[in-house]
C-alpha cells in the first residue's frame, strides 16, 4: 500500500504536464480565448517600435530579447511560487494551463488539413489557406507548391510548436517552456533578414537557433523512429544541413525521407526570391495520402515525446 501511495505522489508531479498536453490534444487553440503569446507579441512590438531606430540597433535588439526571455522565465517562476504558497494544487493548475498554452499540436494539424481541403476546391482557396501558416508569398503558388508548403510547415512546426516546448519543460519546467515560447515569438516577429530587422533581430534569431538546436534533431529522430524509418537517418544527415536554417532542415528532411519526396526550391519572401536547397531527390505530386501519413507521423512523434517528458518528470521529482 505504501509503495503505491509513494508512486502516486511522484506521478502527481507529472500531472500538470499531462493535463495541459491532453487539453491541447482535445481543444487545440480555441479562437477568442486569451493567450500569453498575444501578450508576448505586444511587448515585442512595443520594444521594436521604441528601440529599432538610430545607431547600435543590434545591441538594442539583443538587450531587448534577453530581457524579455529572462523576464518571462523569472515572472513565470515567481507566479508559480506564489501560487504554491496558497496551495500546491493551485500551482499545479496554473502549470497545466501554461502547458496547454505553450503547445500547438492540434491547431497546426487542423490548419494543414484545411489547406489540402481548400486546394482541392480551388487553387485560390488553397493559396489563401496556406497563407495562414507560412511566411512566403502565396499569391502565385501552384497546387503542388501549396501542398508542399503545408507539409514543410507541418514538419518544421512539430519541432517549434510541440517537441521543443516539451523539451524545455523537461529541462526547466514551465518557466523554461514559457521562456522558449518568448524566444520563438521573438524570432517569428523580428528574426528576419530584411532591411528592417537584419540588425535589430539578429540576436533574437540566434537565440532561436540555439533553443531549437537539440529539439530539431530530436524531432527528426522521433519522426523516423515512430514511422519505422530509422534506417533513413543517413538521408537526414545528408539533407538536414542543406537548409538555410540550422534547424528546420532536420524535421523537413525526416518527412521527405518518410514520404520519399522532395521539398525546397525558390520562393518569394517580402517581394524577393529566396532560393532554398532541395531536400530529397524524388520530385513527385503530393496527394492527400501524403498529408495523412505526415499527420500520423506528427501525432505519434508527439505521443512518444510526451511519454518521455512524463517519465523524466517522475524520475526527477
Segments from the language model and where they lie:
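Hydrophobic alpha-helical transmembrane segments
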Residues: 1-178, 191-317
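Substrate/ligand-engaging "lid" and interaction regions
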Residues: 184
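Glycine-rich phosphate/dinucleotide-binding loop and adjoining beta-alpha-beta core of small-molecule
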Residues: 188
Amino acid at each position: 500500500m505504501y509503495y503505491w501511495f509513494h508512486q502516486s505522489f511522484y506521478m502527481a508531479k507529472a500531472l500538470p504536464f499531462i493535463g495541459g498536453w491532453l487539453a491541447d490534444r482535445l481543444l487545440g487553440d480555441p479562437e477568442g480565448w486569451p493567450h500569453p503569446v498575444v501578450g508576448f507579441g505586444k511587448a515585442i512590438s512595443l520594444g521594436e517600435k521604441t528601440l529599432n531606430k538610430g545607431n547600435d540597433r543590434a545591441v538594442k535588439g539583443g538587450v531587448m530579447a534577453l530581457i524579455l526571455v529572462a523576464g518571462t522565465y523569472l515572472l513565470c517562476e515567481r507566479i508559480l511560487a506564489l501560487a504554491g504558497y496558497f496551495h500546491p494544487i493551485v500551482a499545479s493548475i496554473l502549470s497545466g494551463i501554461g502547458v496547454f498554452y505553450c503547445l500547438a499540436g492540434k491547431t497546426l494539424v487542423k490548419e494543414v488539413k484545411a489547406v489540402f481541403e481548400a486546394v482541392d476546391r480551388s487553387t485560390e482557396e488553397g493559396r489563401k489557406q496556406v497563407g495562414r501558416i507560412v511566411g512566403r508569398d502565396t499569391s502565385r503558388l501552384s497546387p503542388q507548391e501549396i501542398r508542399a508548403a503545408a507539409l514543410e510547415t507541418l514538419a518544421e512546426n512539430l519541432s517549434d510548436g510541440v517537441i521543443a516546448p516539451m523539451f524545455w519543460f523537461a529541462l526547466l519546467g514551465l518557466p523554461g517552456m514559457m521562456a522558449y515560447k518568448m524566444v520563438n515569438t521573438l524570432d517569428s516577429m523580428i528574426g528576419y533578414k530584411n532591411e528592417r530587422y537584419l540588425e535589430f533581430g539578429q540576436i533574437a534569431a540566434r537565440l532561436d537557433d540555439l533553443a531549437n538546436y537539440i529539439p530539431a534533431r530530436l524531432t527528426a529522430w522521433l519522426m523516423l523512429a515512430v514511422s519505422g524509418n530509422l534506417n533513413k537517418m543517413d538521408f537526414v544527415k545528408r539533407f538536414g544541413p542543406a537548409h538555410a536554417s540550422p534547424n528546420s532542415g532536420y524535421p523537413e528532411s525526416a518527412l521527405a525521407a518518410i514520404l520519399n519526396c522532395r521539398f525546397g526550391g525558390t520562393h518569394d519572401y517580402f517581394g524577393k526570391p529566396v532560393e532554398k536547397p532541395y531536400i530529397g531527390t524524388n520530385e513527385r505530386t503530393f496527394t492527400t495520402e501524403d498529408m495523412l501519413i505526415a499527420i500520423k507521423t506528427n501525432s505519434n512523434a508527439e505521443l512518444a515525446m510526451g511519454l518521455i517528458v512524463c517519465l523524466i518528470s517522475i524520475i526527477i521529482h
